[in-house]
Structures are given as C-alpha cells and as structure tokens.
C-alpha cells in the first residue's frame, strides 16, 4: 500500500474498473489499482469525479488537499468510527505521568540516534564532531530525566546541536542558520516545513485507521488544533524521511535557491510551484521505497508498512501498559537514502 502524491499539473482524477485514473496535459493518463493505494494527496485544484470520491470513501481511503504552493487545506474522509474501549485506554494512559515519561524517553532516544545516523551518512569532511558530542551528551541524560519538562530540555539541546550540524551540510547559498518555522526564513527550512506537513498529515490518517485519537499524545502537550500523538510518532521519522530527502534533493541539483521566493514584508521564504512539485514527488518516492526500519528485524518495508507496525505496537503498549514494547524505528544500520 502506498500514498499517491498528485501534483498540480493534473487536471482530472476519476475511477473505473477498480483503478484510479489520473490525467494531465503534461504526462497524459496514468492508472493505479485502488487496492494498492493507502490514500491520495492532491496539490492544486484538479477535478475529482463523484465515482472516484465515493470509491475512496467506501474503502476508507483519505483524500488530502494542499494548495499549489504546499499549504494544507483539509481532507475528505469517512466519519471517525473509533473503537471506544481503545480510546478510553488511550486517555487513561495519558493521565499516568510515569507511563507518559517512559514512552516519551523511548521516542526521544530514538529520535536523537536517528539524527546522529543521518549526520554521519551525509558528512564528508565537515566539522560536525562538536555537534555529535553534544547530541551524545543529551542522549545520555534522556533516560535520567525525572519529568517531561527535563526530557524536553535534553531533547531541545540535542535538536539545537543537530541543526547546527545540518548547517555544515547544507550549501551556503541556502542560507540555513538553524530551524525557523511560521514562517520559514530560508529555502532549506521552507522545504523541510513542507515535508513535515506532508508527513504529519500522513501519520494522522494512519493513527485514525488504528482507532486511536491523533489529538491525544504522550510527549507533546495539548494545544488547540494540534494532533499531539501524530507529533509524538513523527519525531523518529523526521530525519530519515524528510531531512534526508531534502538533503538529497539539494545534493542532486533537483532544487536550487532560484526555486524560492521571499516575502519582503514577513521575510517568509516559499517554494515555487515547480519546487513544490519536486518536493512532493521526492517524498512520495521516498515513502514508497523499502528499507530496514525496525530494530532487530532484517526485513525491508515501505514507510507506510513500517508506520503501521509502529502503530500496531503502540496499540499493544496502550492496552498492556508497557512502553518498552513500542517498535523501535532504527535507521542506524542502513543509511536512509540507501
């Protein structure tokens, strides 16, 4: 099962004979068996036929809608029919500080390890030793954290060191000097922000398919409109799925700084239509590729399949109350771009 990403060059999407039919003046017609699709993400304003929408809803496949320049608009999905006992257990676990802290430690530890693996995979002579040392120091203190506040402090220190290291890897013309959001202030931040948005929406859909509530998390604090559980789960995926993809787009010359524009009033930097297409296409290709994602499991999976394994393990963790049983998303044994 894969998530299909459709660029704004597409003008019509229809359904016939068990296949989703995508047509554009640029590429002509493409067909995809609907049973192979986990969902569809659309950019721009293509015409969608009623049979296509009905079939997607009947099969509980989400349709996510983004503007041409990558801003999320909403989604078309079936009503949430979550399993009530599971939701009660989820809420019950969030009221247990020890459970939340233990689960959050596993997430943060793996996030830092995956960030270190990404830096090492992309380093070719750059001086990132100090950043790696800082990340290792923070990692050593994660398990000693006595509260979520302490844990967030160590995670923040590691994140600062990680983005400092990324600053040595990103070409100078991209003017990347650290993470900036709302708005992104340089081309690199603009690309990863778009990627994180695509990843976040993808994970929300996966959470709901497993009858959990995406807005009830364990690591991130509640805030209106924030799917905190999606943010929790995506922490371990940011580096291998998004950051790696963006670094490779730059290294391969697929995008350059000419593909971005800056708002003179706000300083915000946004990708052009063509750059947004390239990023969305690269993200779609990345999550369709197989890799060894699960610690202790030599099998290669697509991102979507590995995400389902992660969520299945989270359901078991919630039901049994044992955070140590959460599947460990480990990219340290295989560079994420492999």
From Swiss-Prot:
The keyword Hydrolase applies. Its cofactor is Mg(2+); Mn(2+). GO terms for cellular component: peptidoglycan-based cell wall. Mn(2+) binds at residues 155, 220, 235. Keywords: Antiviral defense, DNA-binding, Endonuclease, Hydrolase, Magnesium, Manganese, Metal-binding, Nuclease. Disruption phenotype: Deletion of the entire CRISPR-Cas locus (cas6 to cas2, Rv2824c to Rv2816c) decreases resistance to plasmids encoding spacer elements about 6-fold. Pfam families: Cas_Cas1. GO terms for molecular function: DNA binding; endonuclease activity; metal ion binding. InterPro entries: Cas1, CRISPR-assoc_Cas1, CRISPR-assoc_Cas1_C, CRISPR-assoc_Cas1_N. Homodimer, forms a heterotetramer with a Cas2 homodimer. PANTHER family: CRISPR-ASSOCIATED ENDONUCLEASE CAS1 1. Belongs to the CRISPR-associated endonuclease Cas1 family. Encoded in a type III-A CRISPR locus. CRISPR (clustered regularly interspaced short palindromic repeat) is an adaptive immune system that provides protection against mobile genetic elements (viruses, transposable elements and conjugative plasmids). CRISPR clusters contain spacers, sequences complementary to antecedent mobile elements, and target invading nucleic acids. CRISPR clusters are transcribed and processed into CRISPR RNA (crRNA). This is CRISPR-associated endonuclease Cas1. The lineage of its organism: Bacteria, Bacillati, Actinomycetota, Actinomycetes, Mycobacteriales. The gene is cas1.
């Amino acid at each position: 099962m894969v998530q299909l990403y459709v660029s704004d060059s597409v003008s019509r999407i229809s359904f016939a004979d068990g296949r989703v039919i995508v047509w554009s003046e640029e590429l002509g017609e493409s067909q995809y068996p609907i049973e192979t699709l986990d969902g569809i993400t659309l950019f721009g304003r293509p015409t969608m036929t009623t049979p296509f929408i009905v079939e997607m809803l009947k099969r509980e496949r989400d349709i996510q809608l983004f503007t041409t320049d990558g801003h999320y608009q909403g989604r078309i999905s079936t009503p949430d029919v979550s399993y009530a006992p599971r939701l009660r257990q989820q809420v019950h676990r969030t009221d247990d500080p020890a459970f939340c802290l233990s689960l959050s430690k596993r997430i943060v530890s793996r996030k830092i390890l995956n960030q270190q693996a990404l830096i090492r995979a992309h380093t070719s002579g750059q001086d990132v030793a100090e950043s790696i040392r800082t990340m290792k120091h923070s990692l050593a203190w994660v398990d000693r954290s006595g509260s979520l506040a302490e844990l967030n402090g160590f995670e923040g220190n590691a994140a600062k060191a990680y983005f400092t290291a990324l600053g040595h890897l990103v070409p100078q013309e991209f003017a990347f000097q650290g993470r900036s959001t709302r708005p992104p202030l340089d081309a690199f931040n603009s690309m990863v922000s778009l990627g994180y948005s695509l990843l976040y929406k993808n994970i929300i859909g996966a959470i709901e398919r497993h009858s959990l509530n995406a807005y009830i998390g364990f690591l991130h604090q509640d805030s209106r409109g924030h799917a905190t559980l999606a943010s929790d789960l995506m922490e371990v995926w940011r580096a291998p799925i998004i950051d790696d993809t963006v670094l490779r787009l730059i290294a391969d010359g697929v995008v350059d700084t000419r593909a971005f524009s800056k708002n003179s009033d706000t300083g915000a930097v946004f990708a052009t239509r063509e750059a947004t297409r390239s990023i969305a296409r690269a993200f779609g290709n990345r999550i369709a590729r197989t890799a060894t994602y699960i610690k202790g499991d030599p099998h290669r999976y697509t991102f979507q399949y590995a995400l389902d394994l992660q969520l299945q393990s989270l359901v078991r963790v919630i039901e049994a109350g044992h955070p140590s049983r959460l599947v460990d998303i480990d990219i340290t044994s295989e560079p994420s771009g492999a």
